[in-house]
């Protein structure tokens, strides 16, 4: 019979204790950052694992090129992307908060972390990208920003994507965080997941593509994930 050593973590802590420490440490970091800058942070806790996996599902396993993550925070979506099979060398994390940048660099060796403003994406990533991106995956609190900022971000992201690239965004609301009127200046198609009820609070994932891009068959990976 194989025995499990429950005290093989640093300092003699059990794996369970370490998991709790990491989880609640992330919660504390988010709450602290939210109090310091609630508009930029948007949420008081990191995205849950079901929401993170639902977002990662929209990044094709067959895709190539960089995957840009906006507002990674403590890295739950980053972890889901790595578990999805995205190589660390392809990940570019754009984070505004210095403390989160330091945490991400420690937690995810091999991933590139860029401290900067995601709402000025072209300038922030100038000289960083080495080719068209496969996806831009965003955890930014878009609804905290004026509509022109959201539309400009989508246009900026589309300019970095390859032919099959996608812009993935979650929201706690049930309607698209990118307004329909944006189509007057940025031509796009959008699809939404079913609500991810196991996230607290429940959320929905939106996937945006340039209107000229190939459109996928109707399938909802996020919905399948929630049913598991």
Q: For the regions a protein language model found, what residue spans apply to each?
A:
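A short glycine-rich, Lys/Arg-flanked "PGG" loop and its adjoining helix->strand segment in the class I
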Residues: 151-163
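Conserved beta-strand signature within the Rossmann-like core of class I S-adenosyl-L-methionine
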Residues: 161-172
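Conserved class I S-adenosyl-L-methionine
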Residues: 64-73
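Conserved SAM-binding loop of SAM-dependent methyltransferases across substrates and taxa
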Residues: 74-86
């Amino acid at each position: 019979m194989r025995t499990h050593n429950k005290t093989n973590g640093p300092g003699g802590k059990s794996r369970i204790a370490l998991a709790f420490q990491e989880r609640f440490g992330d919660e504390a970091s988010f709450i602290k950052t939210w109090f310091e800058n609630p508009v930029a942070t948007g949420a008081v806790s990191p995205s849950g694992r079901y929401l993170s996996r639902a977002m990662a599902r929209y990044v094709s396993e067959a895709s190539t090129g960089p995957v840009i993550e906006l507002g990674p925070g403590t890295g739950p979506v980053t972890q889901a992307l790595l578990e999805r099979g995205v190589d660390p060398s392809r990940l570019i994390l754009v984070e505004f908060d210095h403390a989160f940048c330091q945490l991400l660099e420690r937690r995810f060796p091999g991933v590139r972390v860029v401290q900067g403003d995601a709402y000025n994406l072209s300038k922030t990533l100038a000289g960083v990208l080495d080719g068209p991106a496969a996806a831009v995956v965003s955890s930014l609190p878009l609804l905290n920003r004026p509509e022109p900022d959201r539309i400009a971000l989508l246009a900026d992201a589309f300019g970095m994507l390859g032919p099959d690239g996608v812009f993935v965004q979650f929201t706690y609301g049930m309607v698209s965080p990118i307004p329909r009127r944006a189509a007057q200046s940025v031509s796009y198609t959008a699809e939404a997941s079913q609500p991810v009820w196991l996230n607290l609070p429940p959320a929905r994932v939106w996937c945006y593509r340039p209107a000229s891009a190939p459109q996928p068959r109707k399938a909802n990976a996020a919905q399948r994930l929630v049913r598991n």
